[in-house]
Amino acid sequence: MKRKISIQSEHQLQKQCVKWFKLQYPKMKMLLFAVPNGAVLAGNDLQRIKQWNRLKAEGATKGVSDLILLVSSGDYSGLCIEMKTIANHSKQTKEQKEFEMAVIPQGFGYVVPKTFDEFRKVVGDYLEKGEY
């Protein structure tokens, strides 16, 4: 009998990573936060468009990374983290790539971890060595 392989969603991965970070680095827990640009909006098409337009007017921007770590380390001002998963071969969108290219010259690091272990390694290396 074949064992069913559980595929982790991006939501589950991000939740696991944030929980780990807050336990591992309690003094910095307020400095890692999510940017809810990918939030699922409720309602019909017209209602969702209105909700997005309201969020956009408040500064929501397509392509901004899922998580931002506002801790300087090494030569970096902070770390932008775009969560992806191995499932479905998820890739960055055009807007996410544009955001990456916009923040790097400003002194921010940018990473795209696809597993919990990758997240732990890049965040640990970033905070401890100033590199990722």
Question: Model-derived features: where do they sit?
Answer:
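Catalytic phosphate/metal-binding cores of nucleic-acid and nucleotide-processing enzymes, i.e., regions
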Residues: 1-132
